[in-house]
Curated annotation (Swiss-Prot):
Any coiled-coil regions, as ranges: none
Biological role stated in the UniProt entry: Mimics host plant CLE extracellular signal peptides that regulate cell fate. May play a role in the differentiation or division of feeding cells (syncytia) induced in plant roots during infection.
Record-given protein name: CLAVATA3/ESR (CLE)-related protein 4A-3
Biased composition (Basic and acidic residues): 125-137, 144-200
Lineage: Eukaryota, Metazoa, Ecdysozoa, Nematoda, Chromadorea
Chain residue ranges for the region called Required for secretion from the host cytoplasm to the host apoplasm: 21-83
Region annotated 4 X approximate repeat CLE, chain positions: 136-210
Subcellular location: Secreted; Host cytoplasm; Host extracellular space; Secreted, Extracellular space, Apoplast
Amino acid sequence: MAKNAMLCLLILRVVLALAFATNKKGDEEPENHSTGIFGKVGRVVTVALAMSSRLGGADATRGGGAVYGGNLKSNQLPNNNWMAPPPPMAIRSAKVYDSKHSPAEYLKKFAQDFRRKTGMHSQRHHEETTLEQEKRVAGAGPDPIHHQDTTLEQEKRAVPAGPDPKHHEETTLEQEKRAVPAGPDPKHHEDTTLEQEKRGAPAGPDPIHH
């Protein structure tokens, strides 16, 4: 930065010196005084700016290259600190089943372990569980014979004598005898009428006398 500032100051001094020199020459020619001074000053300023820009650009490129090179050097690690990647691990193949057990036994064992871990059961176990639950709800279970016996016992409890037709007929006859003590006996009924007639007529109806 200090070098660039010094160069700029030198360029300005040169420009000013040239401007004053042209000013002195311009006094001899008063007609072209204004135009000559401003034109020359403008040209000198443009040349000075071009030179300063070129010098500044060259210094910047040199400095940038040096900085960039320094960054590269700082980023590069020495070989002593470099660590090699670890060797690849040997991948061991998983054992599908032991040599002592057959594949079918291993699959069965695997299925049992999976059900035990996940809490899943087979359909057969589920059906057995549902049957046990039904038996607990209904102690004897849905037995048709036992159900028929139970209904017959309930009917007997409702009707103690049971629906026996023969016994029912005997019961009706006994009820009739209780209502009529002598019972509806035709022969006995005829004897009763003859006795009543004898009582009505003491001598009785003698056919010969009649």
